[in-house]
């Protein structure tokens, strides 16, 4: 045996196949209302889809897009593409046709696998925009062969992990696109393995985890699937996020672990039936994807318990740049609750100024990362790669300050910073202050064009049910804490703040709406 084979590293698909080949009778995966699938049943279904996809021509480096709501087949198809050494490109089920088509065209997708019942019309639209795109469905569809029927007629065969190397592309996707057009990016085997190494080693998992996921399995909803498998746990999948369904599932299934975004936490706390459910089984609630109001996080800890664990990452360095552990959530210190935690020991992290020089504690700087967690670059965008990979660092675009204990507090995206009257204003700080008011459920702050100041600080606020507050009171609250130059010039009350498919406040949509509706400034 050659030394290259003797010391060949393991990658994500090795872990997946090894784990699926053990403990076949252990319960593993259940879609709410459906049967509980054992490890052996998931293994066999994965094997059937491996064979079915191979018959469609999927093999090494074949680019396969996947579009579906939450159902077990999402995991079966994703795992099968990995085992065939193909490249998976998940399409967010709530994404727009334009964004889906952008990824398909930019990444050169060859096959689209979709859920026939829900997405046949979208698949047909995408096929018209991408000539040569082959279609396959699970469930009947008038425009494609049923991959599920083909798979069901095949006999399970042993699963064997492919030989892959660290630089091999495993996944294609897009950045969130909150500041402009989505950016197509590639994620290698190395990056995915680094992410799971950190998650398995650093995240605070119950033993064993009983996981609830309500996020799309094509995206963050699947992030807990492999850890649940490796740690002897189970995963209950909901079709989507609905507060009562989530709380009911936690109570009935004694869920001890879940992953949410901040807006989901707010929706649970504000629901009139919150107090009806027993959530005491929860041991760890992972949360991330966008900033959280410290005041609302304090409320969540006081009402649900000290179970919250924050992760910070981005598509370009996924999930695990920093971690704020459960024990580090100090309800008596709102500055700590505003922190995204400390850098993982598995990555090099620093804060740099506009001239790429390290900044001291207490001074804003851009979070920059290097190490195996960093993605391999944007596709077909050499200019953006040049500005993102600079000076030996990946520049995240997030601005943070570091305290003497090493905790980072993100003050904003560099592109969200407001320049008003020559002053740099970070919306995150104003949002946190507004959210401390007992009448405020959620706040978003943006800059809109102003003839005198360049940009005017503008707040968009969602009130809690049955609560009232005047714009003047909120403006005065910010002025008292941050000075009049940082106080909003206007406050607009809305029923809800638009979100991206990933659950982040969609400030691009907010800016567009406010600029459309704006009256001329005096």
Where are these regions (language model features)?
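Conserved AMP-binding/adenylation subdomain of ANL enzymes
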Residues: 193-210, 218-257, 271
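Conserved AMP-binding A3 loop
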Residues: 36-40, 170-194
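Conserved ATP/PPi-binding loop(s) of AMP-dependent carboxylate-activating enzymes
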Residues: 342-346, 357-388, 425
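Gly/Ser/Thr-rich phosphate-binding loop
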Residues: 230, 255-259, 270-335, 348, ...
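Conserved AMP-binding/adenylate-forming
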Residues: 35, 51-98, 424
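AMP-binding/adenylate-forming catalytic core of the ANL superfamily
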Residues: 95, 112-114, 258, 371, ...
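Structural core segment of the AMP-binding/adenylate-forming
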Residues: 55-56, 83-150, 465-467
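Conserved pre-ATP/AMP-binding loop-to-beta segment of ANL
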Residues: 9-10, 24-25, 137, 142, ...
């Amino acid at each position: 045996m050659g030394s290259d084979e003797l010391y060949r590293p393991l990658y994500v698909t090795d872990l997946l196949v090894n784990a699926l080949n053990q403990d076949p009778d252990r319960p593993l995966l259940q879609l709410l209302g459906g049967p509980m699938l054992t490890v052996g049943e998931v293994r066999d279904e994965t094997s059937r889809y491996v064979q079915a996809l191979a018959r469609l021509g999927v093999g090494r480096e074949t680019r396969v897009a996947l579009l579906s709501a939450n159902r077990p087949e999402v995991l079966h198809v994703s795992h099968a593409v990995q085992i065939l050494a193909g490249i998976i490109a998940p399409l967010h089920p709530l994404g727009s046709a334009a964004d889906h088509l952008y990824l398909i065209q930019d990444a050169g997708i060859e096959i689209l696998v979709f859920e026939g019942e829900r997405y046949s019309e979208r698949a047909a639209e995408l096929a018209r925009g991408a000539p040569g795109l082959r279609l396959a469905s699970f469930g009947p569809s008038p425009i494609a062969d049923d991959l599920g029927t083909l798979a069901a007629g095949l006999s399970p065969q042993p699963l064997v992990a492919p030989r892959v190397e660290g630089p091999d592309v495993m996944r294609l996707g897009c950045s969130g696109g909150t500041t402009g057009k989505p950016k197509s990016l590639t994620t290698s085997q190395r990056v995915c393995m680094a992410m799971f190494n950190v998650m398995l080693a650093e995240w605070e998992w119950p033993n064993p985890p009983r996981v609830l996921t309500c996020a799309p399995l094509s995206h963050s909803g699947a992030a807990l699937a492999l850890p649940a498998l490796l740690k002897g746990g189970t995963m209950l999948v909901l079709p989507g996020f609905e507060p009562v369904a989530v709380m009911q599932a936690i109570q009935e299934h004694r869920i001890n672990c879940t992953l949410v975004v901040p807006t989901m936490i707010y929706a649970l706390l504000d629901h009139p039936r919150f107090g009806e459910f027993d959530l005491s089984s929860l041991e760890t609630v992972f949360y991330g994807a966008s900033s959280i109001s410290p005041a609302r996080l304090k409320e969540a800890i006081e009402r649900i318990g000290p179970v919250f664990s924050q992760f910070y990452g981005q598509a370009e360095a996924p999930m695990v740049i920093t971690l704020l552990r459960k024990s580090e959530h100090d309800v008596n210190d709102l500055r700590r609750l505003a922190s995204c935690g400390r850098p993982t020991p598995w990555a090099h992290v620093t804060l740099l100024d506009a001239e790429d020089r390290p900044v001291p504690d207490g001074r804003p700087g851009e979070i920059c990362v290097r190490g195996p967690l960093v993605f391999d670059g944007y596709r077909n965008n050499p200019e953006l790669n040049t500005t993102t990979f600079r000076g030996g660092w990946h520049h995240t675009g997030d601005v943070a300050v570091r305290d003497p204990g090493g905790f980072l507090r993100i003050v904003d995206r560099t592109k969200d910073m407001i320049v008003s009257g020559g002053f740099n204003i970070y919306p995150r700080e104003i949002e946190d202050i507004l959210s401390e008011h007992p009448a405020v459920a959620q706040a978003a702050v943006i800059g809109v064009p102003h003839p005198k100041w360049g940009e005017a600080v503008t707040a968009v606020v969602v009130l809690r049910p049955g609560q009232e507050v005047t714009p003047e009171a909120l403006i005065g609250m910010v002025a008292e804490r941050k000075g009049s130059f940082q106080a909003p010039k206007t406050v607009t009350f809305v029923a809800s703040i638009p979100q991206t498919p990933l659950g982040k406040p969609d400030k691009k949509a907010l800016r567009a709406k406010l600029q459309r509706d704006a009256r001329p400034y005096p």
